[in-house]
């Protein structure tokens, strides 16, 4: 196995047995590919902006004299890069410029000739761009657009499962759902009449839509029914026999022919009888006249002489009409063939309740339903019906919809028109009748073949189209009214509606969400999330149980584990590891092809629809070396069910054991031993882990950690191979290998690292280099670790030594007892950065001013501010401290004589402003790490702003100069090589300044040319460098684009280090969560016979009932890993020979049964072995992939190899008494996370604060500085204790007795500790409420 440079530093021992067939795909591709489709010009016009433009353009004027045509579009350059947008609070977007052509026609009588053509590029608003990590920067914050799982367009057949009608009769319905346009529903009622609804309006008989499609009654009956033909011969009635139609009927007469009785009267006609009739080739039988009476004729019978209709179609035959027909010479009568079994008379019955009789009346009926109250005219009714389903502007099935529609109706062709036609509607009615007749089945709505994924690109395109349609109306009017000779395309297009539509989508759509940036995993999961909510999706309240449930088609597409707990359960899902969307938007998953029991390396992606036809083996099926199944019977899935199949029947096999789970769930080791509910919590809680100050890779991982860390984009990854030329905390410089260099470039890659930046969740983003000078690196290697990554692997928490035992009740109910050592070593210390803003506005009374001159504030409070009134960087501040001094002008007030006197003495400035400074919120403290000032264009910058500007300019100049020097020196190394090849003394060259090198006289022409070429390159480099500096300088010094009425914004960043403390929430990866109850001194913790104390004590009762046994296996294997690490550490300390070290490590990697990982340490140099050993001394990292992990016997082997008891339990001693505990205790290493539910953020106490307006009770919640609710049960508690005075003050002065609480305050100030409770305000509210009901209620004072 080939290891990359970073992987060689620390190899993870892999317990996986199944071969790796397919690498884990790039985890953010669903976002990036979708947006790429939207942005990139698509010549076919199927996707993205191109499709939107083509669907709206050309726009014709109402009079047809002119049209505006679309030619092409291009996206301009962005003004600010991603980081600048985040700092400035701007949107990362690019201007959209569209080339339009205005064509004006000369109207002749016969044809239109072109009179004039004008082409122009028009600005059409800004399009937000996606960053490389799949996010958008909207108003400075990073957002993610979540993909939506919605019902695919097409036709769906469903039933109410007998719930609608009291009789329990199953009513079937069909629904045609377009991508955009009106829905068309067909439904049966309990009387078996078929109805149609348009857009869920009032229902109409289905015949109305058929008449509107220009069918008359006869044609309708012809389409939907087979005919029985009766002939009148020799005064007898003869039926032309189709034997099949008699099945299941009871013979009401003897069925005989040529004297032979085939079926006796009263007998039920069976398949045997029918076969007999067929065998004897009986084509007709004589029937009694009663048999034809009551039958329904299928066409109109008209007297040819008089033109009188004797009997019209869909009418029952009676004896007299039969006589009439016979008299008039109609000797052949066609009737409808219906029966109760499989040919129901539904359409015929429906025609009877239909009041309309021709196309016009049907159209009027439809018009009345769609536009109630408007008078119908012929033209209006026809237009309305035409526009509903047959006009491309108003109705679009989309390619997906057409494909699903045709597949549902079992048609061969999957392509077709995007609107409906007559055949479509008739085929749907035929199919729903077939289903009612018992042929065919209803669809499963929750099948992933009926739900598709709409990603960012598609949603943005829909929004953009909405904007274009708004513009279209305005353009049409302009084209019709305006003076066309002077008009240019630019005058017609207003970009505002388009910008507004796009902005609204990215800013406030339910699916455009504030990115969850707790840690790299939460970022990746957020981008891979699939939601059933949102525009055109479900709502929480209406979503039933079925939609939320796991469906067999989720296998390998949507994770069955990771979904939120609470009201959104099952509506928000996560994409499985290998899943992707196909061109139609359906989720598909990869499988290996199997032929005659031989598993090939060929991989096919199947969607849920395609998968239904195949037999698919699981990933852990046993295969021999040649690729054949070893067992004759293999467990497989087929049509959503699991059972055993012969190995030669198998068509496909899973690609990997991790295929069914999402990224989050695939990070849980021993997931297969956890109960599903706990696994769900484990997957969700990993997303809440706060990045710790010191990262620590998990000892027990699953092998997915590297993929997550690299794909999330928080690490710096090498773009090209090369050598590390320079490295410091904020920059890495790589000298690129020559074979990867582009022509005429310096061959230098510079990676600037992110330092101590705030994330969306107020955690800290910081990158640290993990390479050293002179190291050779390959493309794709990790150069710098980001938050929660350690040597390019995801590291969300810390490996803790845990013991499962009770300890003095401190781990009752999932509490956690933690050793003080954890705090001392800063194991769970995290950094949190908060941003506080102060906005100075222009008010009616004048501008607000930021200054240190604040009324009624003492010197002490201003001690941390500079002369501009802004806090110093590095100042330590706590709740209530002023960060930015700001005064607001206040309106003139009537002054008291004393105030007038003071004004006269001290001048008037003092009191016409009020203090509105930015203060540190209560309960927050920290260090100021950065201040940024944004000033509106045209407003004078204060001293501090100019200082900050200077600093930024200096830093940028320094950075760019260093970059330039690096490029320059690289260039001069090339020149030096040229000189050396000419035998020129380089020592003399070194004394000359670089610029003089180009003027050295060289005789050889080719070399001279080369030097000239390099000189030109140097000149270009310098020009570019100066240009860059100028651009940056302009960006920094120009005014900022602030919201209307805002003059200045000052942003202050506070950082605070939080150590772990009682009340913080911690969790493992198996859903085992708890709150820290106590931080115990190290000396009191239980310790083993070597004197090593444990870090954490967990309650053993938390395991059996929760059934998350994975944590125990993790603990045991962690112990073994640490034990092996200790042995390596011992060998390093005693300076064992490297050969022995190599042997020992090799042995450790070879442990286990038929593993796929083959590590050959003989290929490693001695230095590499030493470096590996140093990284393994704290424990050998182990990977145990999901469903393919370490077995029990392998864990025992590891424990034995580490010299530990194979039971995993050891004797512990009580730290307080030194006595042995009475039985061995499970001790080992578990990976623990600190979750973002910190007690510091939740602690809250109210003194005096705001009150609710109506009830006059204190508000609730920390944000409102509210109180704690003293509820019904708490009142009972005080009553039970008989604490009447306490209860009285709780219900009055401490709550809503307005006068009482004011007096109380006064009494306390005066030192008089008495209270005078009065009437609680809520009692008055009750009185008012009762009076509002018209009951007069008054209090009588005694």
Swiss-Prot record:
Matching Pfam families: RNA_pol_Rpb2_1, RNA_pol_Rpb2_2, RNA_pol_Rpb2_3, RNA_pol_Rpb2_45, RNA_pol_Rpb2_6, RNA_pol_Rpb2_7
One Gene Ontology MF term: ribonucleoside binding
Reactions catalysed: RNA(n) + a ribonucleoside 5'-triphosphate = RNA(n+1) + diphosphate
UniProt GO cellular component terms: DNA-directed RNA polymerase complex
Entry annotated with the keyword Transmembrane helix: no
Domain of life of the source: Bacteria
Keywords of this entry: DNA-directed RNA polymerase, Nucleotidyltransferase, Transcription, Transferase
SUPFAM superfamilies, sorted: beta and beta-prime subunits of DNA dependent RNA-polymerase
Entry-linked CDD domains: RNA_pol_B_RPB2 (cd00653)
UniProt-listed PROSITE patterns: RNA_POL_BETA
E.C. code: 2.7.7.6
The keyword Transmembrane helix is assigned to this record: no
Root EC class: transferase
Cross-referenced InterPro entries: DNA-dir_RNA_pol_bsu_ext_1_sf, DNA-dir_RNA_pol_bsu_external_1, DNA-dir_RNA_pol_su2, DNA-dir_RNAP_su2_dom, DNA-dir_RNAP_su2_hyb_sf, RNA_pol_bsu_bac, RNA_pol_bsu_CS, RNA_pol_bsu_protrusion
Gene3D superfamilies, A to Z: 2.40.50.100, 2.40.50.150, 3.90.1100.10, DNA-directed RNA polymerase, beta subunit, external 1 domain, DNA-directed RNA polymerase, subunit 2, domain 6, RNA polymerase alpha subunit dimerisation domain
One GO BP annotation of this record: DNA-templated transcription
Oligomer status and interactors: The RNAP catalytic core consists of 2 alpha, 1 beta, 1 beta' and 1 omega subunit. When a sigma factor is associated with the core the holoenzyme is formed, which can initiate transcription.
Similarity comment: family membership: Belongs to the RNA polymerase beta chain family.
Functional summary from the UniProt entry: DNA-dependent RNA polymerase catalyzes the transcription of DNA into RNA using the four ribonucleoside triphosphates as substrates.
Stored NCBIfam families: PRK00405.1, rpoB
Protein name per its UniProtKB record: DNA-directed RNA polymerase subunit beta
Lineage start: Bacteria, Pseudomonadati, Pseudomonadota, Gammaproteobacteria, Enterobacterales
């Amino acid at each position: 196995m080939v290891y990359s440079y970073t992987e060689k530093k620390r190899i993870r021992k892999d317990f996986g047995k199944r071969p790796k067939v397919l690498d884990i795909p790039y985890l953010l591709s669903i976002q990036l590919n979708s947006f790429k489709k939207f942005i990139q010009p698509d010549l076919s016009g199927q996707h993205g902006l191109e499709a939107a433009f083509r669907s709206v353009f050309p726009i014709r004027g109402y009079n047809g004299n002119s049209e505006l045509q679309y030619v092409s579009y291009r996206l301009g350059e962005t003004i600010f890069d991603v980081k600048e947008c985040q700092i400035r609070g701007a949107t990362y977007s690019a201007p959209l410029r569209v080339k339009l052509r205005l064509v004006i026609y000369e109207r002749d009588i016969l044809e239109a000739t072109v009179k004039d053509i004008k082409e122009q590029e028009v600005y059409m608003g800004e399009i937000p761009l996606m960053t490389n990590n799949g996010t958008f920067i909207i108003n400075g914050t990073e957002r993610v657009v979540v993909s939506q799982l919605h019902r695919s367009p097409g036709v769906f057949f469903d039933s109410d499962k007998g719930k609608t009608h009291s009789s329990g009769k199953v009513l079937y319905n069909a629904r045609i759902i377009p991508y955009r346009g009106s829905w068309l529903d067909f439904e049966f009622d309990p009387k078996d009449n078929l109805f149609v609804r348009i857009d869920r309006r009032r229902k109409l008989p289905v015949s109305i839509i058929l008449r509107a499609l220009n069918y008359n009654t006869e044609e309708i009956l012809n389409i939907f029914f087979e005919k029985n033909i009766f002939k009148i011969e020799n005064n007898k009635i003869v039926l032309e026999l189709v034997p099949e139609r008699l099945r299941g009927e009871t013979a009401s007469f003897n069925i005989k022919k040529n004297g032979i009785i085939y079926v006796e009267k009263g007998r039920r006609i069976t398949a045997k009888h029918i076969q007999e009739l067929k065998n004897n080739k009986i084509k007709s039988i004589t029937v009694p006249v009663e048999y034809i009476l009551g039958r329904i004729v299928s066409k109109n019978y008209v007297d040819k002489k008089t033109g009188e209709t004797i009997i019209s179609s869909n009418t029952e035959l009676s004896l007299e009409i039969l006589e009439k027909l016979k008299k008039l010479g109609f000797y052949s009568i066609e009737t409808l063939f219906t029966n109760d079994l499989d040919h129901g008379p539904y359409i015929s019955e429906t025609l009877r309740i239909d009041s309309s009789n021709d196309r016009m009346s049907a159209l009027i009926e439809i018009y009345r339903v769609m536009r109630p109250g408007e008078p119908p005219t012929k033209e209006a009714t026809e237009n309305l019906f035409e526009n509903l389903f047959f006009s491309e502007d108003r109705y679009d099935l989309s390619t997906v919809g057409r494909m699903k529609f045709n597949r549902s109706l079992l048609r061969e062709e999957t392509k077709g028109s995007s609107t409906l036609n007559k055949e479509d509607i008739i085929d749907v009615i035929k199919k729903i009748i077939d289903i009612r007749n018992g042929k065919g089945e209803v669809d499963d709505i929750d099948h992933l073949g009926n739900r598709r994924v709409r990603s960012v690109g598609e949603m943005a395109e829909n929004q953009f189209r909405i904007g274009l349609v708004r513009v279209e109306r305005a353009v049409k009017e302009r084209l019709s009214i305006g003076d066309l000779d002077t008009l240019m395309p630019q005058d017609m297009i207003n970009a505002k509606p388009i910008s507004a539509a796009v902005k609204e989508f990215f800013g406030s759509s339910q699916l455009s969400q504030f990115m969850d940036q707790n840690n790299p995993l939460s970022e990746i999961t957020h981008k891979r999330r699939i939601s059933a909510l949102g525009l055109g999706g479900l709502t929480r309240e209406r979503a039933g149980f079925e939609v939320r449930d796991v469906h067999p088609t989720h296998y390998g597409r949507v994770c069955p584990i990771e979904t939120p707990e609470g009201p959104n359960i099952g509506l928000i899902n996560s994409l499985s590891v290998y899943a992707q969307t196909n061109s139609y938007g359906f989720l598909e998953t990869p499988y290996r092809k199997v032929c005659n029991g031989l598993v090939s390396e060929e991989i096919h992606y199947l969607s849920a629809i395609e998968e239904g036809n195949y037999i698919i083996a699981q990933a852990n099926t046993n295969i021999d070396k040649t690729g054949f199944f070893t067992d004759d019977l293999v467990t497989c899935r087929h049509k959503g069910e699991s059972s055993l199949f012969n190995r030669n029947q198998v068509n496909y096999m899973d690609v990997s054991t991790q295929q069914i789970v999402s990224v989050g769930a695939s990070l849980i080791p021993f997931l297969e031993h956890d109960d599903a509910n706990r696994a769900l919590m484990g997957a969700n809680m990993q997303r809440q882990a706060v990045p710790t100050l010191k990262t620590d890779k998990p000892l027990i991982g699953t092998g997915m950690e590297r993929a997550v860390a690299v794909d999330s984009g928080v690490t710096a990854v090498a773009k090209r191979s090369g050598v590390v030329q320079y490295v410091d905390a904020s920059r890495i410089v790589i000298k690129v290998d020559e074979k990867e260099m582009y022509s005429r470039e310096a061959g230098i890659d510079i990676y600037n690292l992110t330092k101590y930046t705030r994330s969306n969740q107020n955690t800290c983003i910081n990158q640290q280099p993990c390479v050293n000078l002179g190291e050779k690196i390959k493309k794709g290697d990790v150069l710098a670790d980001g938050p929660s990554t350690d040597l390019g692997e995801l590291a969300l928490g810390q490996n803790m030594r845990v013991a499962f035992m009770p300890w003095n009740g401190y781990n009752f109910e999932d509490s956690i007892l933690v050793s003080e050592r954890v705090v001392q070593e800063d194991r769970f210390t995290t950094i949190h950065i908060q941003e506080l803003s102060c906005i100075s506005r222009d008010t009616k009374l004048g501008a607000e001013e930021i200054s240190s001159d604040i009324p009624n504030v003492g010197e002490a409070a201003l001690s941390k501010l500079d002369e501009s009134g802004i806090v110093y960087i590095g100042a330590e501040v706590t709740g209530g401290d002023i960060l930015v001094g700001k005064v607001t002008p206040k309106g003139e007030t009537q002054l008291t004589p004393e105030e007038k006197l003071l004004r006269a003495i001290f001048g008037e400035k003092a009191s016409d402003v009020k203090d509105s400074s930015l203060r540190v919120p209560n309960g927050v403290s920290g260090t100021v790490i950065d201040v940024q000032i944004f000033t509106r264009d045209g407003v004078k910058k204060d001293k501090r702003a100019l200082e900050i500007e200077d600093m930024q300019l200096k830093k940028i100049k320094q950075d760019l100069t260093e970059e330039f020097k690096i490029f320059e020196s690289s260039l001069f190394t090339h020149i030096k090589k040229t000189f050396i090849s000419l035998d020129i003394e380089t020592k003399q060259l070194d004394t000359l300044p670089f610029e003089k090198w180009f003027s050295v006289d060289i005789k050889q022409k080719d070399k001279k040319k080369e030097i000239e070429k390099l000189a030109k390159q140097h000149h270009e480099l310098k020009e570019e460098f100066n240009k860059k500096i100028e651009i940056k300088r302009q960006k920094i010094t120009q005014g900022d684009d602030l919201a209307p009425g805002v003059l200045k914004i000052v942003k202050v960043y506070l950082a605070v280090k939080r150590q772990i403390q009682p009340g913080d929430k911690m969790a493992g990866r198996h859903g085992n969560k708890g709150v820290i109850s106590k931080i115990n001194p190290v000396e009191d913790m239980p310790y083993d016979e070597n004197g090593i104390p444990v870090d954490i004590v967990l309650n053993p009762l938390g395991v059996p009932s929760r059934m998350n046994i994975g944590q125990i296996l993790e603990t045991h294997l962690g112990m073994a890993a640490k034990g092996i690490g200790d042995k390596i550490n011992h060998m390093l300390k005693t300076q064992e020979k490297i050969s022995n070290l190599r042997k020992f490590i090799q042995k450790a990697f070879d442990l286990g049964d038929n593993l796929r990982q083959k590590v050959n340490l003989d290929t490693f140099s001695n230095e590499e072995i030493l470096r590996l050993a140093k990284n393994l001394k704290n424990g050998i990292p182990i990977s145990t992939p999901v469903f393919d992990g370490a077995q029990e016997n392998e864990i025992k082997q590891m424990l034995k190899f580490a010299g530990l008891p194979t039971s995993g339990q050891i004797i512990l001693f009580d730290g307080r008494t030194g006595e042995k505990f009475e039985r061995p205790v499970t001790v080992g290493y578990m990976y623990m996370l600190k979750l973002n539910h910190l007690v510091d953020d939740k602690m809250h106490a109210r003194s005096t604060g705001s009150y609710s307006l109506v009830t006059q009770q204190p508000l609730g919640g920390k944000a409102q500085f509210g109180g704690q609710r003293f509820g019904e049960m708490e009142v009972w508690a005080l009553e039970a204790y008989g604490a009447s005075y306490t209860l009285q003050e709780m219900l009055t002065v401490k709550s809503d007795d307005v006068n009482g609480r004011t007096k109380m305050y006064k009494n306390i100030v005066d030192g008089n500790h008495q209270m005078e409770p009065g009437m609680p305000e809520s009692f008055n509210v009750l009185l008012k409420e009762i009076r509002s009901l018209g009951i007069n209620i008054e209090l009588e004072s005694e």
